[in-house]
Amino acid sequence: LRLSGVYRLTQIIEHFGEYMTVSMIAGFAVSFATYFHAVFTHTTHRMSGNFMYDFFMGAALNPRIGPIDLKMWAEVRIPWVLLFMISVSGACQQYEQYGYVTPNMAFMVLATGLYLNACAKGEECIPQTWDMFHEKWGFMVIFWNFAGVPFTYCYSIVYMAAHPPEYYRFSTPTYVFMYALLLFAHFVFDSSMAQKSRFRMQLQGTLKVRWSFPQWPWSTLSNPRYLQTEHGNALLIDGWWQFLRKPNYTADWTQAFLWGAIAGTRSVIPYYYSVFFLAVLTHRCGRDFER
């Protein structure tokens, strides 16, 4: 569409506020529609009786349109695709303005592209997550997928699009280090998540590996070692999980920090994602350890 002139990709970054507003409205609309549909069709799940709480947390667990699980579809197909398109839009704007794309903006295109790829190619692992099998599809999840993730995790992209490259220029060795660290962190994140999810599927007898590109090495463990807890849960102690308790969280946060660091140190705004995500991961660790 961009090459044909039908749609300029720079419009996303140029009209960032308008796109964000539409996404917010869509988040509210889908939340209300999903809630009342569940109530009227008697498909509610674990209701408290308090409207505000139930609307926020959700009424339906896994609403569907035909064979499509809306919660699973919205978790990947909306937020990460939008975030990747915002990064591409920022790169296109720099190319139009300067005649080149800075290594910093190219870094964000690579980073968001890798994350989108990891989520899309590993969709068979998503049903194993807490978000899918326990959390309901309410305002908290819907609004965050429609507006929160794509329009807050992109602050470094917006910052670089609004400021000259001199504000966030690094030396060549620094770029090499940051790119290398991103790729290593993503490898650990992607492969450790795959190890955990496929281990669970191995125990359930449901493992079916998809060979979507790229499949990182060490993503599927053969005869993995694990501990059996008093509560009957099996804890993986093989692969990345033999070295630390939360390799996926550590690598995921490293990526988040790099997303901010690539925009330099003149503003704290690009670091919003890493600070927010640290709070989220701290809460998740507490929840996991309690379980």
Q: Which ranges hold each PLM region?
A:
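Hydrophobic transmembrane alpha-helices
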Residues: 1-125, 132-197, 201-220, 227-291
